């Protein structure tokens, strides 16, 4: 059983949790962390980029109120996934049944948490989710700011990526010691019928780019190759050297995101391998 010291000190002043009290303690923890969070679990995703893995949608009340994408480019607010998100909001399972489903996943099963929605906003629920995962590889991204909580989740084998709004923000988030991903211009996505060679040429020869403070950014491989998250798993583990993964703006609101990024904050300089750099062309 995973222990929650802050709760144990409140319920058991001696700091000890006797075996006869386990059921009672779990009930108290459930009461203390009760929220209206709802979830939809898809056992085998049909998402082309994810691949055939389990995925979870969390209700919209898990999203931070200050998320910059709220109404300003969040892909989950429109399109087919918005219908599934509404299903989670209206008729999704509650938190405890979700945890039971996660515990039943195969031992080494990669899965995706939060194709819409975010992590539980309270730390106790976050750590219960992390404990239920039991060290499985998982794809998790958050716009939340409970950085100490995410470190604790990481220690339980629940690897959390924090999402940056632009590359300057990515530099700030990198100082937390957590894995970072960042939204970048849709120019970094390979265009339909564009060859890989032409794509590389358009971006200056190499795909590697840099933040203002010199941290390495690489585009999500699924944005320019036929790979899937199941094949890649780059975001499911810590990345050597703190490499930041860039996700090109996508979805029906990508132009809106590009406009927000038009100040250049998410158009990092491209390393041509010749000691110089160029800027990708401006978004249309």
Residue ranges and their predicted role:
Residues 2-284:
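Class I S-adenosyl-L-methionine
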């Amino acid at each position: 059983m995973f222990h929650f010291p802050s709760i144990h000190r409140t319920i058991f002043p001696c700091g000890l949790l006797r075996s006869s009290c386990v059921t009672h303690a779990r009930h108290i923890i459930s009461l203390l962390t009760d929220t209206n969070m709802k979830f939809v679990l898809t056992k085998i995703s049909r998402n082309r980029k994810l691949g055939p893995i389990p995925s979870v949608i969390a209700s919209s009340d898990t999203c931070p109120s200050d998320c910059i994408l709220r109404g300003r480019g969040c892909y989950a607010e429109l399109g087919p996934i918005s219908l599934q998100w509404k299903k989670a909001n209206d008729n999704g399972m509650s938190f405890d049944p979700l945890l039971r489903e996660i515990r039943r996943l195969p031992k080494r099963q990669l899965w995706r948490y939060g194709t819409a929605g975010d992590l539980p906003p309270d730390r106790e629920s976050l750590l219960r989710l992390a404990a239920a995962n039991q060290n499985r590889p998982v794809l998790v991204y958050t716009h939340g700011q409970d950085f100490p909580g995410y470190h604790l989740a990481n220690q339980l084998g629940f690897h959390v990526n924090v999402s940056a709004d632009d590359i300057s923000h990515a530099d700030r988030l990198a100082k937390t010691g957590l894995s970072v991903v960042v939204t970048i211009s849709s120019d970094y996505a390979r265009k339909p019928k564009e060859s890989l060679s032409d794509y590389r040429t358009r971006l200056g020869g190499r795909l590697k780019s840099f933040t203002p403070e010199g941290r390495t950014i690489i585009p999500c491989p699924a944005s320019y190759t036929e790979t899937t998250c199941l094949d890649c798993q780059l975001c499911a583990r810590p990345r050597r050297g703190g490499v930041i993964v860039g996700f090109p703006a996508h979805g029906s609101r990508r132009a809106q995101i590009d406009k927000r990024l038009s100040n250049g904050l998410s158009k990092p300089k491209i390393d041509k391998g010749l000691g110089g750099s160029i800027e990708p062309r401006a978004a249309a």
